[in-house]
Swiss-Prot record:
Known role: One of the primary rRNA binding proteins, it binds specifically to the 5'-end of 16S ribosomal RNA.
Family: Belongs to the universal ribosomal protein uS17 family.
Gene Ontology cellular-component annotations: cytosolic small ribosomal subunit
Annotated source species: Burkholderia mallei (strain ATCC 23344)
GO biological process terms on file: translation
Name recorded for this polypeptide: Small ribosomal subunit protein uS17
Keywords for the protein's UniProt record, in alphabetical order: Ribonucleoprotein, Ribosomal protein, RNA-binding, rRNA-binding
GO MF terms held by the record: rRNA binding; structural constituent of ribosome
Quaternary data: Part of the 30S ribosomal subunit.
Length: 90
């Protein structure tokens, strides 16, 4: 038999934190551009994900990378893996 190493390729997405009001949870807005099948125009599609934030360290406006994990709760199956860019404070 072939001894192959099993690697888990978890999906990662980059989005903006739009809410951090829940305990240990942030809401991340992920936007992507999709070409319209008929008109050919690029349209911005978006989706919100609830992501696990163990230490409550991320604030609204932060650009974060989230990674797919096992389900933590009914609506939460993603976890924040790293901070890409902090929000600018004015």
């Amino acid at each position: 038999m072939n001894d192959s190493v099993k690697t888990s390729l978890k999906r990662t997405l980059v989005g903006k934190v739009v809410s951090n009001k829940m305990d240990k949870t942030v809401t991340v807005l992920v936007e992507h551009r999709v070409k319209h099948p008929i008109y050919g125009k690029y349209v911005v599609r978006s989706k919100k994900y609830h992501a696990h934030d163990e230490a409550n360290t991320y604030n609204e406006g932060d650009l974060v990378e989230i990674q797919e994990t096992r389900p933590v709760s009914k609506t939460k199956a993603w976890a924040v893996s790293r901070l890409v860019e902090a929000a600018r404070v004015i």
